[in-house]
Regions:
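Non-catalytic nucleic-acid-binding/docking modules located in mid-to-C-terminal regions
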Residues: 35-38, 127, 142-301
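Noncatalytic, basic helical substrate-engagement surface that gates or grips nucleic-acid strands
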Residues: 1-114, 118-145, 223-239
Length: 301
């Protein structure tokens, strides 16, 4: 595992995320051998979500400065490695991924979504799988491939009911409040008994435990709003285009520039290139200028 405190020796620019990002991309490409590979970035803000819930994701901590500094370089490296980059201001990367999956599967392609986000379970089925990364707390578990059975076993409801489930329990990571006191077990039980969110709302007079009935009556419209928030929108423009070619010389130059020497040597060996001599390093002062606004999140697809 790459250390998060790695830095370029000449000016102490952080490179830990770059090391980990490159390793993940290359490992995934080697293990999955896809026909094409796209990476989706958030450019900040989601117009459709904020229109329903102005507090959407408002509780999230600021991205660590070291990560913000590396994001422009992460994007540059991603392109050099031959991965398509997809992003659109005002549209969440999750919606762009769901749109791409919808378009590609409709034309007969198989898709793998690489993400730990449980929301993507609603896309799984038919030609779509979800590949989740190793848990931070237990990396020995490795990457896990989730089909319909896997998603159902993990969440407790099938993919087509995950949005109903999330509308009821809420999503703390996105600042979406569910019904107060309703946890996973209760939501799964209600959905199994009543067939989905609208069935639950319609059965308010017989819902058990009885203490939830008044809350359901008074908050039904808000919970329906939750459903809009957690259901992916799949009608955004998306064109697969041509798969970019890997720029081996460009990657070698990039790794040299970032002083990622061990990664550079491995990459040169992999591509049959002569190893470059290590440059002499003259330390420079670290720039204190504010980093440019860049995407805060990347998802692999």
């Amino acid at each position: 595992m790459e250390r998060s405190n790695l830095r370029r020796q000449s000016d102490q620019f952080p490179t830990g995320a770059l090391h980990g990002w490159m390793k993940s991309l290359l490992d995934l490409r080697e293990s999955e051998k896809p026909d094409r590979f796209a990476v989706f970035f958030d450019l900040g803000g989601s117009d459709r979500h904020l229109a329903v819930l102005p507090e959407y994701k408002a509780q999230r901590d600021e991205t660590p400065e070291d990560i913000v500094l590396q994001l422009p370089e992460i994007k540059r490296l991603t392109g050099l490695l031959g991965f398509q980059i997809v992003e659109k201001r005002g549209v969440e990367a999750d919606d762009l991924i769901a749109t791409a999956v919808h378009r590609l599967t409709a034309s007969g392609h198989e898709c793998i979504i690489v993400s730990a986000d449980k929301d993507f379970g609603q896309c799984v089925g038919g030609k779509v799988l979800q590949l989740t990364p190793p848990p931070t707390a237990n990396p020995a578990l490795g990457w896990r491939r989730m089909d319909v059975a896997g998603v159902t076993a993990k969440i407790g409801v099938p993919p087509e009911r995950i949005a109903d489930y999330l509308a009821l329990v809420g999503d703390a990571s996105d600042n979406i409040p569910g019904l107060r006191g309703v946890g996973p077990k209760t939501a799964v039980k209600w959905i199994a008994e009543h067939g989905g969110l609208e069935g639950v709302l319609a059965a308010v007079e017989s819902i058990q435990p009885e203490r939830f009935r008044e809350q359901i009556r008074t908050e039904a419209d808000r919970i329906r709003g939750n459903l809009k928030l957690v259901t992916f929108q799949t009608d955004f423009p998306f064109e697969p285009g041509d798969q970019p070619a890997e720029d081996v010389d460009g990657v070698i130059d990039f790794l040299g520039e970032m002083e990622m020497h061990s990664t550079l040597r491995r990459y040169q060996v992999k591509h049959g290139r002569k190893e470059s001599p290590l440059p002499s390093v003259v330390p420079k002062a670290v720039s204190k200028s504010s980093p440019p606004a860049e995407p805060r999140q990347g998802e692999l697809f």
